[in-house]
Amino acid sequence: MTATIVRPLRGRMEVRGLRGPRGDEPSNRSMFKTATGKAIRPTWVDAPEGAPRWQGYWVIAREHLTDVAEAIAIRDGQVEIEMHYSATEQCDRRCRSAEGDECTCSCEGKYHGNNHHASWIDVGETTLVRSAGSKTVTRTLTRHQAQEDRDARLEEWIRQLRE
């Protein structure tokens, strides 16, 4: 079973289907804390009464999406990430010039932080609009891609320290 991270439009993320540690691996809580390097407060939500324990899940602050997803993919081989996007399909100029990975608009993160205009139409000072329905997108992050992404961020961080 592949673990799934569900990132709703608002609120904390759910990490479902995450296997327990094997051998000398740290607990899942410790893995989250190590991955984020921050004060993270993962909360375990028990499975409904009578259901198997594996139907329980972790709840984590959404700002830890990248770090937690990479840690799970590196340990388990891959993780699926279910991301929910706004039903109003509005993409904001602030999205295109943003830093970080928090995007809930209808661009599905494609234009987040890269100032890409695509087929968006300017409406007012900051809002861009395109018509369509609501979206849920599931992406898979593999161990190889997670390690490459983590290494690239580390190299960029080191480069910035040297400047």
Give the ranges of each region predicted by the language model:
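Accessory DNA-engaging acidic/polar modules
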Residues: M1-E163
